[in-house]
């Protein structure tokens, strides 16, 4: 039996898995003494319970207990024993009514005031506070359990999400694997189809044993003709050839001369309904009629068709996987349009093979309507066995397999191969003139521009109006660079350098020459960028001067803008000195090779040009790469011209300008070998590049138009400094070459006396006239090329629009003309 006066405390419990279990109730015994218990019994003597809420039930045992309590109160005065009894009875009633487990809220007990000692009141208050604290602890525990349950739910949801994500990733990986497997299966199927096609095309001539007893009887059909033929126990039969074969026009980069051997071995046979008799006399083997090239399904069993001729007529209904019709070896069968639906489709393809690729579906349907039946005559079998005599006759009098489409392609490739060097030389000659024009500009008009800019620079501090422009500052920079490089090259002794190089071994000289060529190309690629940046820095210098006068730029920033162009000027000067030194060493090395006794070094240097073929021919090139190679060939050609000119004049000066026939012949042979090797190597290189990459020779004319468009720029009205923009495209820097020419030729001109001054004036006038003449030629070529290109583009656009509109109307005419041409060829 449980005591009703015992309180219970709820304590949360947990397991090892951190799972919360239901609350456990632990009994709490209140510490109440006997005096306190007696006082409590006296308190509730005249109690009257007033319910505050009608909804809450009040546990009252019976009315007799109340009456008994009243009687006990009346007899209370008589004796103390009666008081103790009444106190015991009232305490029992209090115990019965004071049930802590029952919920009695919203009630009020009205009693009379009784004097109670303070310690008892304090103890009662403490008990109440303990009870309230216990209730608060219980509420906190309940809240904690709710929070823990929420956390557990969140963790469970996270785990479920992670599992779902893992499942999705696994599914994605499985899908990728399936896709890879499908791709592999497709590749394997394509390989099998290619092998089957090759087996069907390259099937050798196999002997066929014909047995008279095992041949099937021909089925009765409409319009059949039986022609008995002599049976041979052993004969040879040629395998049929595909009638409709697509010509692959894909671009191939392989240098093999015959990449499509299948098209050369087996030639497609054009057969029509109107020329059935001609095909009989011309082609001894039966043609293989094909529905379409896409539906060809050849299997390894197709090689054994010769052994399965007995079942061909019985399996004629299975036309979905079969693409050919096997003829009867004894009887010629005339097939009509009412015989089977497959004959109409086959006749359609047989008639469509003779037409061109531009025929439409409407023309094919018209051909099927007109050619309702084809009379296929039986093949005349060879009555004689194979012999050595027939083999020799075929070798001596046999013909060659030919294919018109492939023959035209090969012929066009040969024409392009021969035509490429001519187009290349036109482009290189134009670029040579452009480089020569910019080279002569440094000797003719740049000194005048430099002199005028220098005078304006001297006058500018004294006048506010005469300020230097960007072009004038750039001219001053270029003149300073040229003069500095000339002074630098004068400190180099050419004779000492010549004998030092001549004393080296041949192999060492060969290595030195190759290193100098590589350095030259690197310097050319870097030099043009330096001069472009120098121009823009001079522009910033002029803009900083204007802003400084207006007070828009602070002093520190203005100082950096002023010092920037001068640092660029130092870098450009160092570059020109280094590049000119490389070219000067290259000229002396070439001079040593020309003047050598056995010409071994010259042959090595010429063979070095042929090494370029290995690095450029057998590679894949785009149009941009081809244009870059063409521009580098232009620069190399012009540098070779300047080098040979310097060597000729240097050798003439060593002979005291005594021009003899031996010297002239020797120099002409050397110049011819060096120049001819350059031309030959460039022609071979570009011819094979265009052949392997399927480029047309008209590509060089497009490059010509590109260069001419930059020269004939509408923004430049007088065409002044137009070659400078072309030099950026070509990659030609004229300053190092000009510095070498001045370094070599200044000692040939006498510097003292009137004769020297008069000679210099004459040379200057000749150079000016030569530059003007070259400029006129360049502008004329540019204008003519641009106008021709515009005319060709307009004609091409108009022809394309007209051809697209009339293409549908001319399809039937093309079919008729193609059939007539094929008939004429066969009759011939």
UniProtKB/Swiss-Prot annotation:
Residues 67-83, 212-233, 302-321, 797-822 have a biased composition (Low complexity). It comes from the Eukaryota. Its main location: membrane. Keywords: Membrane, Transmembrane, Transmembrane helix. GO terms for cellular component: endoplasmic reticulum membrane. Residues 67-92, 212-236, 297-346, 797-828 are annotated as: Disordered. The chain crosses the membrane at residues 428-448, 472-492, 562-582, 722-742, 754-774. The keyword Acetylation does not apply. Pfam families: DUF747. It is found in: Membrane. It is a multi-pass membrane protein. The keyword ATP-binding does not apply. Belongs to the TAPT1 family. This is Protein TAPT1 homolog.
């Amino acid at each position: 039996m449980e005591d009703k006066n015992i309180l219970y405390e709820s304590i949360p419990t947990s397991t090892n898995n951190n799972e919360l279990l239901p609350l456990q109730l632990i009994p709490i015994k209140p510490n109440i003494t006997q005096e306190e218990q007696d006082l409590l019994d006296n308190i509730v003597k005249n109690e009257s319970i007033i319910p505050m809420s009608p909804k809450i039930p009040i546990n009252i045992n019976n009315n007799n207990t109340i009456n008994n309590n009243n009687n006990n109160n009346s007899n209370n005065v008589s004796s103390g024993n009666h008081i103790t009894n009444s106190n015991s009875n009232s305490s029992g009633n209090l115990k019965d009514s004071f049930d802590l487990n029952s919920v009695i809220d919203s009630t009020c007990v009205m009693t009379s005031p009784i004097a109670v000692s303070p310690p008892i009141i304090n103890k009662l208050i403490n008990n109440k506070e303990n009870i309230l604290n216990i209730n608060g602890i219980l509420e906190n525990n309940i809240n904690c359990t709710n929070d823990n349950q929420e956390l557990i739910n969140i963790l469970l949801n996270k785990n479920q999400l992670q599992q779902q994500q893992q499942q999705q990733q696994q599914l994605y990986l499985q899908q990728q694997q399936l896709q890879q497997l499908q791709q592999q299966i497709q590749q394997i199927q394509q390989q099998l189809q290619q092998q089957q096609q090759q087996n069907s095309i390259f099937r050798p001539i196999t002997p066929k044993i014909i047995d008279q007893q095992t041949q099937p009887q021909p089925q009765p059909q409409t319009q059949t003709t039986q022609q008995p033929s002599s049976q041979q126990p052993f004969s040879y039969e040629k395998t049929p050839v595909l009638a409709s074969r697509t010509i692959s026009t894909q671009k191939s980069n392989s240098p093999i001369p015959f990449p499509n051997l299948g098209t050369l071995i087996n030639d497609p046979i054009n057969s029509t309904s109107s020329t059935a008799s001609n095909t009989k006399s011309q082609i001894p083997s039966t043609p293989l009629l094909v529905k379409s090239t896409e539906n060809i399904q050849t299997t390894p069993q197709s090689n054994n068709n010769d052994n399965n001729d007995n079942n061909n007529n019985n399996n004629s209904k299975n036309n979905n996987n079969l693409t050919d019709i096997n003829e009867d070896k004894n009887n010629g069968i005339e097939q009509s349009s009412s015989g089977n639906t497959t004959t109409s489709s086959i006749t359609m393809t047989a008639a469509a093979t003779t037409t061109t690729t531009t025929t439409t579906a409407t023309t094919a349907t018209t051909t099927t309507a007109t050619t309702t039946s084809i009379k296929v005559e039986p093949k005349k079998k060879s009555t004689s066995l194979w012999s050595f005599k027939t083999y020799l006759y075929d070798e001596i009098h046999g013909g060659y397999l030919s294919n018109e489409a492939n023959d035209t392609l090969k012929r066009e490739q040969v024409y392009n191969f021969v035509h490429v060097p001519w187009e290349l030389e036109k482009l290189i000659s134009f670029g040579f003139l452009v480089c020569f024009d910019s080279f002569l500009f440094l000797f003719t008009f740049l000194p005048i521009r430099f002199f005028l800019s220098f005078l304006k620079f001297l006058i500018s501090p004294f006048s506010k109006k005469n300020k230097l422009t960007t072009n004038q500052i750039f001219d001053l920079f270029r003149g300073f660079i040229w003069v500095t490089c000339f002074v630098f090259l004068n400190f180099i002794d050419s004779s000492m350098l010549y004998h030092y190089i001549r004393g080296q071994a041949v192999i060492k000289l060969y290595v030195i020459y190759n290193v100098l060529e590589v350095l030259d190309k690197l310097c050319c690629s870097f030099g043009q960028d330096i001069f472009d940046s120098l121009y823009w820095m001079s522009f910033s210098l002029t803009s900083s001067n204007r802003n400084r006068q207006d007070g828009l730029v602070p002093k520190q920033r203005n100082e950096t803008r002023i010092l920037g162009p001068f640092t660029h000027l130092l870098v450009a000067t160092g570059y020109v000195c280094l590049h000119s030194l490389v070219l000067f060493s290259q000229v002396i090395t070439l001079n040593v090779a020309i003047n050598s006794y056995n010409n071994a070094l010259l042959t090595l240097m010429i063979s070095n040009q042929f090494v370029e073929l290995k690095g450029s021919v057998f590679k894949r090139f785009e149009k941009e790469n081809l244009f870059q190679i063409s521009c580098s060939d232009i620069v190399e050609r012009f540098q070779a011209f300047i080098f040979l000119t310097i060597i000729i004049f240097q050798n003439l000066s060593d002979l005291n300008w005594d021009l003899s026939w031996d010297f002239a012949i020797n120099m002409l042979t050397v110049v011819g070998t060096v120049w001819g090797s350059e031309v030959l190597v460039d022609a071979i290189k570009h011819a094979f590049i265009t052949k392997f990459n399927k480029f047309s020779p008209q590509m060089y004319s497009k490059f010509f138009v590109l260069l001419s468009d930059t020269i004939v720029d509408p923004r430049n009205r007088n065409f002044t400094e137009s070659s400078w923009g072309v030099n950026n495209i070509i990659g030609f820097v004229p300053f190092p070459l000009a510095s070498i020419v001045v370094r070599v030729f200044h000692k040939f001109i006498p510097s003292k006396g009137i004769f020297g001054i008069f000679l210099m004036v004459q040379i200057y006038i000749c150079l000016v006239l030569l530059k003007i003449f070259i400029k006129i030629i360049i502008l004329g070529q540019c204008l003519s090329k641009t106008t021709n290109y515009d005319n060709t583009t307009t004609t091409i656009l108009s022809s394309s629009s007209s051809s697209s509109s009339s293409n549908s109307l001319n399809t039937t005419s093309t079919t008729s003309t193609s059939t007539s041409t094929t008939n004429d060829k066969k009759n011939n």
